[in-house]
């Protein structure tokens, strides 16, 4: 699968369910659900204890709105970064969500996920 050749709409169709799952799983602190689409590289750095600390220390990560707005795609090397405008159910303001997708063993996987 050549992810880089896909249109923005095709990328959105792939990325949105992954992002929605990350938001839902983060809100309920579900480690298994949160990491289910992670690449092996991401899994290595996202152990359950570390994620638990992030969820405990950052209210934003457990209060994300299920509504987001797609902002665009950035294609670089073998990865596509998908950008979202994200809000929180409890924290005022708008946040930038970043989802880095790539292909591992023929499947689209998460190689990065952050929110600022």
Give residue spans per PLM region:
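Surface-exposed, charged secondary-structure patches
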Residues: 53-103, 112-116
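Short, low-complexity N-terminal intrinsically disordered segments enriched in polar/charged residues
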Residues: 1-28
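Short amphipathic alpha-helical segments enriched in hydrophobics
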Residues: 26, 30, 59-62
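Structural motif
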Residues: 105-107
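Cystatin/cathelin-like cysteine-protease inhibitor module
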Residues: 13, 109-114
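Short, well-ordered alpha-helical segments enriched in acidic and aromatic residues
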Residues: 27-41
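A solvent-exposed, acidic/Ser-Thr-rich amphipathic alpha-helical stretch
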Residues: 40-58
